[in-house]
C-alpha cells in the first residue's frame, strides 16, 4: 500500500523530469520559430509522456518519446543539408514583390489581404507599395524588405560614424548584487558601494534598488522601487481613478 502511494506521488515528478530532459536535448526554440518538425515533436512527446500519469506504462512511454527524439534529431540534421532540405523543410513563399501583392502566394499560405496588411503593420509599414519584398518564412514569420525610399534613415546615409553599441551591464537586480558580473568587469563590491555612495545611496538601501547597471562610460544607473515622481504632471496621467 505504501509503495502505491509513493508511485502515485513520484510518477508526475518522474514524468516531468523526463519530458524536461527530452526537450532540453531537442534544443531551444521559441514557439514562433518552430517549423513543422519542431511542432510535431512537441505534440508527440507531450502526448506520449503524459500517458504514464493515467496508466502504468512508464518504460514504454519513455522508449517511444526517446525514439521520437532520435528521429527528430536525424531529420533536423538532414534538413541542414541542401540535398535534403528542399524535401524536409517548406520553402519561403513570396507575398509581395516590388510593391505588388502576390495573390498566388496568399492562396498557397491561406492568408487574406487583411491578414497580410496586419503583418505589415506589425513591421511598421502601412502601404504594400512601400515594400520591395515580403516573404513568409518556414517558421510562419513574415519578413519584410522595404523599398529604398521607404526604409528608415541609416547613420551612413548622413555620412556620420555611429558609436559601437554597448549593452548596459546589470550589477544589481531586485536588491541583490550580481557578483559574477562584477567579476567579469574585474570589479568588487567595495567599488560598487563607492559608486552607490557617490549617487547618495547607502549600501544599506540595496534592497530598494530594482535594477542597477553600468554604462559604457562606467557610470551607474539606478532604478528604485520607491518612485519619487512629481504629482499632477500631465505627462504622468493614467486613465482611471487612481491618479
Swiss-Prot record:
Its main location: membrane. Gene3D superfamilies: bsu07140 like domains. Disruption phenotype: Non-essential, it can be disrupted. This is UPF0702 transmembrane protein YkjA. Belongs to the UPF0702 family. It is found in: Cell membrane. GO terms for cellular component: plasma membrane. Pfam families: DUF421, YetF_N. The chain crosses the membrane at residues 3-23, 34-54, 58-78. Keywords: Cell membrane, Membrane, Transmembrane, Transmembrane helix. It is a multi-pass membrane protein. InterPro entries: DUF421 (IPR007353), UPF0702_alpha/beta_dom_sf (IPR023090), YetF_N (IPR048454).
Amino acid at each position: 500500500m505504501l509503495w502505491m502511494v509513493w508511485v502515485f506521488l513520484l510518477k508526475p515528478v518522474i514524468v516531468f523530469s523526463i519530458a524536461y530532459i527530452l526537450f532540453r536535448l531537442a534544443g531551444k526554440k521559441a514557439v514562433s520559430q518552430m517549423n513543422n518538425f519542431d511542432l510535431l515533436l512537441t505534440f508527440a512527446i507531450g502526448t506520449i509522456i503524459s500517458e504514464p500519469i493515467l496508466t502504468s506504462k512508464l518504460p514504454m512511454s519513455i522508449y517511444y518519446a526517446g525514439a521520437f527524439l532520435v528521429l527528430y534529431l536525424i531529420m533536423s540534421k538532414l534538413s541542414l543539408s541542401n540535398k535534403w532540405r528542399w524535401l524536409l523543410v517548406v520553402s519561403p513563399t513570396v507575398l509581395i514583390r516590388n510593391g505588388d501583392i502576390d495573390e498566388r502566394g496568399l492562396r498557397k499560405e491561406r492568408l487574406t489581404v487583411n491578414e497580410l496588411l496586419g503583418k505589415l503593420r506589425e513591421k511598421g509599414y502601412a502601404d504594400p507599395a512601400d515594400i520591395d519584398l515580403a516573404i513568409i518564412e518556414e517558421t510562419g514569420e513574415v519578413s519584410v524588405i522595404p523599398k529604398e525610399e521607404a526604409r528608415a534613415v541609416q547613420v551612413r546615409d548622413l555620412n556620420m560614424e555611429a558609436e559601437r553599441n554597448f549593452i548596459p551591464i546589470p550589477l544589481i537586480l531586485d536588491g541583490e548584487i550580481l557578483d559574477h558580473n562584477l567579476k567579469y568587469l574585474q570589479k568588487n563590491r567595495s567599488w560598487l558601494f563607492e559608486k552607490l555612495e557617490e549617487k547618495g545611496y547607502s549600501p544599506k538601501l540595496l534592497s530598494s534598488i530594482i535594477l542597477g547597471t553600468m554604462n559604457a562610460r562606467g557610470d551607474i544607473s539606478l532604478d528604485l522601487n520607491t518612485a519619487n515622481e512629481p504629482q499632477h504632471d500631465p505627462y504622468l496621467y493614467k486613465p482611471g481613478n487612481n491618479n
